[in-house]
Amino acid sequence: MAAKAFFDIKAGDERLGRIIFELFNDVPDTTRNFRELCTHKNNFGYKGSVFHRIIPGFMCQGGDFTNGDGTGGKSIYGNKFKDENFNHKHEAFSLSMANAGPNTNGSQFFITTVPCSWLDGKHVVFGKVVSGIDVVKKMESLGSTSGKPSKKIIIEDCGEC
């Protein structure tokens, strides 16, 4: 059975709700990294971090818990880790690793809001939203073409479910 993880999301002072992700079994290193960052097993992770880049009609990006602006973050394996495979495609509401080129996965991730086939083979898809699509759509509505959200979008809590 596939592992699941959750984010409880806030926009400013307003609670938007919970997103539940199903994590794929065929990318075990990537899903382990995400799960342990959700649970803070190594005393660092996603809780309290922000979605720093949200582009309507594309995606919501977060996971930079060190700098909060897309320049930081780290994996449970050290700084960066390899691309495991590209078995899954970027469909709407896919969970995928953000990177700076091949084999540069850290902690940053994004949730697609539409199919993004041009990202296939470049970013590792490791899960999908199974509950809380309405929350992702609310987050998306607070984004902009520049990517800067109109409100601070925070992962108030996170973990495994």
From Swiss-Prot:
Protein's GO biological process: protein folding
Q: Name one GO cellular component term.
A: cytoplasm
At the top level, the lineage of the source is: Eukaryota
Task: Give tissue specificity per the record.
Answer: Found mainly in the tegument, gut epithelium, and muscle layers. Also found in the interior of the parasite.
Q: Per UniProt, which keywords does this protein have?
A: Isomerase, Rotamase
Q: What is its EC number?
A: 5.2.1.8
- Where would I find the PPIase cyclophilin-type domain in this sequence? 6-160
SS bonds (residue pairs) = none
The reaction(s) annotated as catalysed by this protein in its Swiss-Prot or TrEMBL entry are: [protein]-peptidylproline (omega=180) = [protein]-peptidylproline (omega=0)
Top enzyme class of this protein?
isomerase
Activity control, as annotated, is: Binds cyclosporin A (CsA). CsA mediates some of its effects via an inhibitory action on PPIase.
Q: Which PROSITE patterns match?
A: CSA_PPIASE_1, CSA_PPIASE_2
What the entry lists under InterPro entries is as follows: Cyclophilin-like_dom_sf, Cyclophilin-type_PPIase, Cyclophilin-type_PPIase_CS, Cyclophilin-type_PPIase_dom
GO terms of molecular function: cyclosporin A binding; peptidyl-prolyl cis-trans isomerase activity
Name the family the entry cites: Belongs to the cyclophilin-type PPIase family. PPIase A subfamily.
* Free-text function comment from the UniProt entry: PPIases accelerate the folding of proteins. It catalyzes the cis-trans isomerization of proline imidic peptide bonds in oligopeptides.
> What is this protein called in UniProt?
Peptidyl-prolyl cis-trans isomerase
Q: Which organism is the protein's source?
A: Schistosoma mansoni
